Curated annotation (Swiss-Prot):
Annotated catalysed reactions: Cleavage of an N-acetyl or N-formyl amino acid from the N-terminus of a polypeptide
Family: Belongs to the peptidase S9C family.
InterPro entries: AARE_N (IPR045550), AB_hydrolase_fold (IPR029058), PD40 (IPR011659), Pept_S9_AS (IPR002471), Peptidase_S9_cat (IPR001375)
Protein's recorded name: Acylamino-acid-releasing enzyme 1
Assembly notes: Homotetramer.
Gene3D superfamilies linked: alpha/beta hydrolase
Keywords tagged on the record: Cytoplasm, Hydrolase
Molecular function terms from GO: omega peptidase activity; serine-type endopeptidase activity
General function of this protein: Catalyzes the hydrolysis of the N-terminal peptide bond of an N-acetylated peptide to generate an N-acetylated amino acid and a peptide with a free N-terminus.
Source organism of the structure: Oryza sativa subsp. japonica (Rice)
The keyword Metal-binding appears for this protein: no
Entry keyword Manganese: no
Subcellular location: Cytoplasm
Residue positions of the active site: 627 (charge relay system), 718 (charge relay system), 750 (charge relay system)
Length: 775
């Protein structure tokens, strides 16, 4: 009732719908401060190229900036000349101004750095444009009609734009051209092949085709193409079954005249399903590596990629013995094909899990019969204290190799931190390259021969670029030294800098509260929580922050949104409960079958931990989370009534029995409720007992106990947790008389990541918490 009365009062005063009259000034001041956070640029990709002089090189860094007025993210390229001297110090000489990439969907420098490919995808039926730039001019502009293919895939999953070594051809993944639709006119159905133009004819819809779900609702079939950058000729790669969706294409060594790519089956591989299941954030979709001939090679010159005689399709499956293979990379000498596998996620059904790394010895003659897969980095089940917890890899550089041709540099998760690792694919040695004693997160941006360009940040400390060099020590393991690089990026305003400077940052080890003999050893280990606090934290209000997934992690890297909430005077307790990435496979697999209980208990245990240590005021605690974090948020206000003064949920999972029939990942409901057995009992038609279990473990089963004022932020285009889930729960709270506020973003999907939506979301969270924490 309080929200309704406030809205009526606001309407009478001519204020926006839903505006609380008492919070108008707070709304204005917080929005002004949040805009200052939005102005801080983000660091994207980077590329480094060798120069003719031995101790110099060239760098390109992509920088992003939010344009709230246009509701989009703008991108820029910044160039730098790198000079190294004998004392291992390095100097970056940046260009005075960045170059804006307006209308550019992707930027792909050639391996030598002498050419630059710009992709301009069209938002309508106009041709896709590929621009090939040389040192001083536009060398070619290629227009590709929709009849050839649709937009190129530039996302982090299917994307695979790849130059060949000679820099004459580019392979890429694009939307398959649209299939013919039935056409009708005054005489009824218009038969195919008719060349008559009839202004009275119209096209029907034809058969419906499944998509890959969340964020891919307008995409159907990713297909493989190669373009000659000189002639502009585009050829589709033949021989790939239409049931395979392709991505992550790379060129094999030149002698092979072939391409290697990842493919996902539309029936979910060996886990046969009648549909495509959502693939965004889902590493548990079976996939494999394939090889196919370069379509520009003459038939007589093509090597035989067939596994056996009589096989007509040129596509060869390279990883038949594994259920998952992605992120393929060839070693510089072409001897090894190295890749990542999420076979643990496939086997268990969880949407993400501990990765493994493997390699294939690539045959010099290009004959691919009888290839075997060797392990490089195995799955870590239960890490020893302080030791490597396993590989958690969300991407790999296009060129991740040091000059020895055997060592890869990549980013991974280690507990609550992102770290940089070196992996020797021959010796199988894994080492941590980023500072051992740092709780900050580190990510690799690019390699400069045997040196590393990286970015480091903490939850509320803006990213800073570093340059790392390996230092040899006699009789001791080599160490990496890191030099902070001055950049022309604008610093946060004096006001923000002053606020953020006054903080404490730590990663807490939280002992579990309910250890039992049934738990695997890894599940008995402490989990972690990131605690960002003011010096007088015990008198300040605190926000508990919960990640989604549940098999993701909230790393210690910079978050604009959390830095903004901290600036409002809150401590932040970010809980990486058991089931999160970065703590070994046994801890992760302890959660499926126990959601709504184990994860809820871990959050309450972490909260109790900081309360008992006198770090926070127990009477001033709020909670916020999205997706599975929203599941936990709504569970907590029901299972622990009176604990939280206020709550905010972004696209929360509130009722699994409703979600299972509407989400793009219905099998998630079965796996997280039943554990590993859920993978086998998944059905598009849940039984009565299934629906009862789903309801029993859902937050809505505890809703009668809720009294916490709750804010809901929902995306109307969400296919992962459809808007009906949050609306049902929120409407029930309103029916019960609990103070509730709902904001629906009509054009947003699950991430609520359109700039204006993200801004309005966290502005309202800040104001909502201020209103209820100030009472």
């Amino acid at each position: 009732m309080a929200t309704t009365q406030a809205s009526e009062a606001a309407t009478e005063k001519g204020l926006p719908l839903g505006m609380d009259v008492s919070m108008v000034d707070e709304y204005a001041s917080q929005s002004k401060l949040l805009q200052e956070f939005v102005k801080i640029p983000t660091i994207g990709n980077a590329w480094i190229f060798n120069s003719k002089t031995e101790n110099t090189s060239r760098a390109i860094v992509s920088v992003g900036q939010t344009d709230l007025l246009a509701n989009k993210k703008r991108s820029f390229l910044l160039n730098s000349h790198i000079s190294k001297n004998s004392s291992n110090s390095v100097d970056f000489q940046w260009s005075p101004f960045p170059i804006e990439m307006s209308g550019v969907s992707a930027v792909i420098p050639s391996p030598s750095g002498r050419k630059l490919l710009l992709i301009r995808n069209s938002e309508d039926d106009s041709p896709t444009k590929l621009e090939v730039w040389g040192p001083c001019q536009l060398e070619n502009e290629i227009h590709i009609a929709q009849s050839v293919h649709g937009s190129l895939y530039v996302d982090e999953w299917f994307e695979g734009i790849s130059w060949n070594q000679e820099e004459t051809l580019v392979a890429y993944v694009a939307e398959e051209p649209p299939q013919p639709k039935p056409e009708f006119n005054d005489s009824g159905y218009k038969k195919a092949g008719s060349s008559e133009k009839d202004c009275k004819s119209w096209k029907g819809k034809g058969d419906w085709e499944e998509t890959w779900g969340e964020t891919y609702s307008k995409k159907r079939i990713p297909a493989l193409f190669v373009v000659n950058i000189s002639s502009g000729e585009v050829r589709a790669v033949k021989g790939i079954p239409r049931t395979l969706s392709v991505g992550q294409v790379i060129w094999a060594p030149s002698s092979s005249h072939s391409l290697v790519f990842v493919a996902w089956s539309s029936d979910n591989g060996y886990q046969k399903t009648p549909r495509k299941l959502g693939i965004k954030y889902c590493f548990n979709r079976p996939c494999a590596l394939y090889a196919v001939p370069d379509p520009f090679m003459e038939e007589a010159d093509k090597p035989s990629l067939n596994v056996s005689k009589g096989e007509t399709a040129p596509t060869t499956k390279l990883t038949s013995e594994l259920s998952s293979a992605f992120f393929p990379r060839f070693s510089p000498d072409g001897k090894y094909l190295v890749f990542i596998s999420a076979k643990s996620a496939i086997d268990s059904g969880t949407h993400n899990a501990t990765n493994s790394m493997h390699k294939i010895d690539w045959p010099a003659d290009g004959k691919l019969e009888g290839l075997s897969v060797a392990d490089v980095v195995p799955i870590v089940m239960c890490p020893q204290d302080g030791c490597f917890p396993g590989l958690y890899c969300s991407g790999i550089l296009r060129n991740p190799w040091l000059t020895d041709g055997q060592t890869m540099i990549l980013s991974s998760i280690w507990g609550s931190k992102e770290v940089i690792l070196s992996v020797n694919v021959v010796s199988r040695e894994v080492s941590r390259v980023s500072p051992q004693d740092s709780d900050y997160s580190w990510n690799v941006l690019a390699l400069d021969k045997d040196n590393i360009l990286a970015v480091s940040s903490s939850l509320i400390t803006v990213p800073q670029i570093y340059y790392g060099s390996e230092v040899c020590q006699t009789g001791k393991p080599n160490q990496w030294e890191w030099q902070e690089i001055a950049t022309p990026f604008p610093s946060p305003s004096d006001k923000i800098s002053a606020i953020l400077a006054d903080h404490k940052f730590s990663i807490l080890k939280i002992p579990i509260s309910n250890s039992s003999n049934k738990l695997a050893d890894g599940a008995k280990l402490p989990f972690e929580a990131i605690f960002v606090s003011w010096k007088d934290s015990a008198t300040r209000p605190t926000i508990v922050v919960l990640h989604g997934g549940p098999h993701t992690v909230y790393p210690s890297s910079y978050s604009k949104s959390l830095a903004f909430l901290y600036s409002q005077g809150y401590n932040l307790l970010v809980v990486n409960y058991r089931g999160s990435l970065g703590f070994g496979e046994e801890a992760l697999q302890s959660l499926p079958g126990n959601i709504g209980s184990q994860d809820v208990n871990d959050v309450l245990t972490a909260l109790d931990f900081v309360i008992k240590k006198g770090l926070i005021d127990a009477s001033k605690v709020a909670v916020v989370g999205g997706s599975h974090g929203g599941f936990l948020t709504t569970h907590l206000i029901g299972q622990a009534p009176g604990t939280f003064v206020a709550a905010a949920a972004r696209n929360p999972v509130c009722n699994l029995s409703l979600m299972v029939g509407t989400t793009d990942i219905p099998e998630w409901c079965f796996v997280e409720i039943y554990g590993k057995e859920g993978k086998n009992c998944f059905s598009e038609y849940p039984s009565f007992d299934d629906l009862c279990q789903f309801h029993q473990k859902s937050p809505i089963s505890h809703i009668s106990k809720v009294s916490t004022p709750t804010l809901f932020l929902l995306g109307a285009q969400d296919l992962r947790v459809p808007v009906s889930n949050g609306l049902q729960y929120a409407r029930t709270l309103k029916e019960m008389g609990v103070e509730t506020k709902i904001i629906v973003f009509p054009e947003d999907m699950h991430g609520l990541d359109k700039p204006q939506s993200d801004f309005e979301s966290f502005l309202n969270i800040g104001v909502w918490f201020k209103k209820h924490m100030s009472k």
